[in-house]
Amino acid sequence: MNPNMPPRLCSQRGNALVEFALVLPLLLLIFAGIVDFGFLFQRYEVITNAAREGARIGVLPGYDEAAVQQRVLDYVQAGLSMSAGDAVAALTPPPDVDTVMLAAGTGAPFAATQVTVSFTYNYLIIGPIVNLVTGGDWTASITINSRSTMRREIVGS
């Protein structure tokens, strides 16, 4: 510090504010990323549970492919607050195909069918936050895929 400088120029007041102003955007971006990852994880859990719920319904007698798809879409709509047009659900194969004969523990044969429910969801990464700051139309997304397979067992078939 030069003793000939006026005290006003030698003051340290305001340094912390300037440093905070320089670091704040980075801290906000990190915080937004943490929040966005939380939303992504929540979406993944809903998609996974929806596929599992669809497979669970698919192995029950009396339910067809349309009922399974509707159950999955209802679960996703309730969990993600989205419209039916935003979701894509696929049931492969339908519950009444690909029958395989297995031996049950009692020795009686029974038919088993694999029911697989797949669900795909596109998640927009930090898009609303980036669009708010830039005023642009940024649309980077992650595709979340979930698949659940359960076995339908029909004793005595």
Model-based region annotation:
Residues 2-3, 56-157:
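Short, conserved structural patches
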Residues 2-76:
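Alpha-helical assembly-interface signal, strongest on the long, hydrophobic N-terminal helix that forms
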